[in-house]
Amino acid sequence: MQDAERTTNDPVDRIEKVTWRDLQDGSFTAELKRLICFAAPMAAVVIIQFMIQIISMVMVGHLGRLSLASASFAVSFCNVTGFSFIIGLSCALDTLSGQAYGAKLYRKLGVQAYTAMFCLTLVCLPLSLLWFNMGKLIVILGQDPAIAHEAGRYAAWLIPGLFAYAVLQPLIRYFKNQSLITPLLVTSSVVFCIHVPLCWLLVYKSGLGHIGGALALSLSYWLYAIFLGSFMYYSSACSETRAPLTMEIFEGVREFIKYALPSAAMLCLEWWSYELIILLSGLLPNPQLETSVLSICFETLSITYSIPLAIAAAASTRISNELGAGNSRAAHIVVYAAMSLAVMDALMVSMSLLAGRHVFGHVFSSDKKTIEYVAKMAPLVSISIILDSLQGVLSGVASGCGWQHIGAYINFGAFYLWGIPIAASLAFWVHLKGVGLWIGILAGAVLQTLLLALVTGCTNWKTQAREARERMAVAHESELTESELPI
């Protein structure tokens, strides 16, 4: 506690901007190494988490068209109305816990994780009612009754997974904000190894059919949360940051919501814009071809985004830690290092995709028209990969600094006032069809990246560090004065 008091009273360094000369003293190279050591295993974690979802879909897909269509619709619905919102709300911890760790208020990480679990569990209650009645709702909206019925059953069996997600996401950020990536990598790998045979048994051997895919996913999320919770409780690596359950978790609800709502808005506004493009593709002539091609392109973008997402997570953690410690110069250097990694990754991946544009369509489809259309879209997808890498890291910078509200405004303007209107105009009025839709979402991504870069470039890092220190000083005072009554 004395360390924390000394840390929160330490002065903020006087550096407002980092110059080129500052980047040549070894700090930049050292930061690159830190980010790579963080991002490499984190990328593996992201890929494994993605594959857990894919495995369920692949196994369900072998049951037939109705099972695949209903499961795909249910997963898309649940992602938009639930999982995306839970992930977005939990991103508040990227600011709060990251800066608390930098300020050496270690115990706050455990308290904030419990606060997040409590808030997210409450959010799951109305969401679960929505999922339970999904089948009836989408029939009213005009969906095929057979697909709607089976999709509703699939969503209902995903409800336990939603509550698991409310516990899991704060735990993931609890470890990430301490740069403890090994527990995430080990537990996600173990869960994946369990999920594959579990999903196979439930889908093919239990008689549950496609419902088994949803149940397997829910059970795997609970296993993941239990494993991480056990590591948090028993590991000596978490001895300083874990906290007992006290009334203190309720006192942090207001602060959590302050950052959680704009965090959710920032993430969901971008996520939902891509889902809207898929829906618009269904209104085009030959909707089966257009939707299939755009789905393949978005799936490719999701896979290639794993590395930028890991770099963004590393940047967010490092920046929040340094700002919490009052090191404005170090936080600014992290931005340069993270953007350098993002540029290198974007160029390598986009050029590889462009070079193999006549090949990668075969991975997803055997239909000749689909493969040719995917090859035609490849140059646009390559540009999207570059923009996604840059904006992903810039969004990580925003989370580390606590600018989620600015990011939400930017994403709303870039996609809903600019990108999607352009997409609809090009697709339906200029008759560019799927290409027009992608150009529109690309225009939104360009504006989003430029605005995030402008905000980052105009940032006074000394002021950011001072604000973080003031926030942590208030947190430290409350930690010293509040009474900790057991629940």
Swiss-Prot record:
Any stretches that span the bilayer, and where are they? Answer: 35-55, 73-93, 122-142, 155-175, 184-204, 211-231, 264-284, 293-313, 333-353, 377-397, 412-432, 435-455
User: What membrane topology term does the record carry?
Assistant: Multi-pass membrane protein
Organism of derivation: Arabidopsis thaliana (Mouse-ear cress)
Keyword Transmembrane helix, does the record have it?
yes
* One cellular-component annotation, GO: membrane
Q: Which domain of life is it from?
A: Eukaryota
What is the name attached to this protein's record?
Protein DETOXIFICATION 10
Which keywords, in A-to-Z order, does the entry hold? Membrane, Transmembrane, Transmembrane helix, Transport
GO terms, molecular function: antiporter activity; xenobiotic transmembrane transporter activity
What NCBIfam families would the database entry show? Answer: matE
Q: Where, per UniProt, does this protein localize?
A: Membrane
Coarsely, its chief localization is membrane
